[in-house]
Amino acid sequence: MPSISIPADPTNPRQSIKAFPIVINSDGGEKGRLVKQLRTTYLNDLDTHEPLVTFINTYGFIYEQDRGNTIVGEDQLGKKREAVTAAMVTLGCGPNLPSLGNVLGQLREFQVTVRKTSSKAEEMVFEIVKYPRIFRGHTLIQKGLVCVSAEKFVKSPGKIQSGMDYLFIPTFLSVTYCPAAIKFQVPGPMLKMRSRYTQSLQLELMIRILCKPDSPLMKVHTPDKEGRGCLVSVWLHVCNIFKSGNKNGSEWQEYWMRKCANMQLEVSIADMWGPTIIIHARGHIPKSAKLFFGKGGWSCHPLHEVVPSVTKTLWSVGCEITKAKAIIQESSISLLVETTDIISPKVKISSKHRRFVKSNWGLFKKTKSLPNLTELE
């Protein structure tokens, strides 16, 4: 099967996301305090002609509170309850924040109530109770609440039970500055569309998870031959392209490989709606595929919509994109099983934003490895 390789440089910061080191303050007693931390990322080099916007993500813990209690500060909350589980609450896109000021100090004003519900699957309702004024222009703050998949946004949703009130208290704050043109997401229904009249363009990313040799992840994923963690293959649906011509065999393969190469695809990774893959088509986009890209040929694919289990791993473990391939398949499932994939490795990996730098903190290990951690600073 013909293939075209994509250049990759795992050392490039454009293919990584920096993670928060774990820092605990202790006064010599039994309890430890997990220090609040801020991570800022700048993607302004991707498009210097566009105004900047910011994406805010918070990572922290859900605490339980007896029914009937009023909302209390996190210091009092921590003394009464231990963390139930970890979670991610995404505030979404908002205006440029030229100065963050004492944003970590203002996180004490950030409180979110958590309710569990269900439709076709379990869901979580996050309602903003108190928030720092600096975030008042961001999507979730303006809406006031959001209902999301429990599996995608909560580490262990099975620990959230009836008869209790729960609060989310953020500990880690991620702020990403990026050009406004980048923030385009393909509507979900479009990504699900299949037709016998189109070819489907997929993107396969080989992601190296930078875990330790004794990590349980090594048993779940393929160990890296270089001894640097483990590898996972992630597929994204990029677009559909109408078929044209009446070519067969090698001529057909060459036609689609050339069409894919002409798009000049480039991939990056950044913390936008959580860990997010950014695709940029620098070349010619076929007319039938233009709806899958925004202004300037950009499209974003939040990984929690594609691989929730891997995404929750990336909350606390670093990763880097090592390879990227374009896969051209029949869009129709009945035709897909009768044909072979056309693989084009000519997908560029962004030289500056290819990595999530290895993480030294772990949201998922707190209650296990640090059972006395009940307060947040």
Curated annotation (Swiss-Prot):
Record localization: Virion
InterPro entries: Matrix_C, Matrix_N, Matrix_Paramyxo_C, Matrix_Paramyxo_N
Keywords: Host-virus interaction, Viral budding, Viral budding via the host ESCRT complexes, Viral envelope protein, Viral matrix protein, Viral release from host cell, Virion
One GO term describing the cellular component: viral envelope
Keyword NADP in annotation: no
One GO BP: viral budding from plasma membrane
Motif (FPIV motif): 20-23
Molecular functions per Gene Ontology: structural constituent of virion
Domain notes: Late-budding domains (L domains) are short sequence motifs essential for viral particle budding. They recruit proteins of the host ESCRT machinery (Endosomal Sorting Complex Required for Transport) or ESCRT-associated proteins. The matrix protein contains one L domain: a FPIV motif.
Protein family according to the UniProt entry: Belongs to the morbillivirus/respirovirus/rubulavirus M protein family.
Chain's role: The M protein has a crucial role in virus assembly and interacts with the RNP complex as well as with the viral membrane.
Official protein name in the record: Matrix protein
Organism, as annotated: Parainfluenza virus 5 (strain W3)
High-level lineage: Viruses, Riboviria, Orthornavirae, Negarnaviricota, Haploviricotina
GN (gene name): M
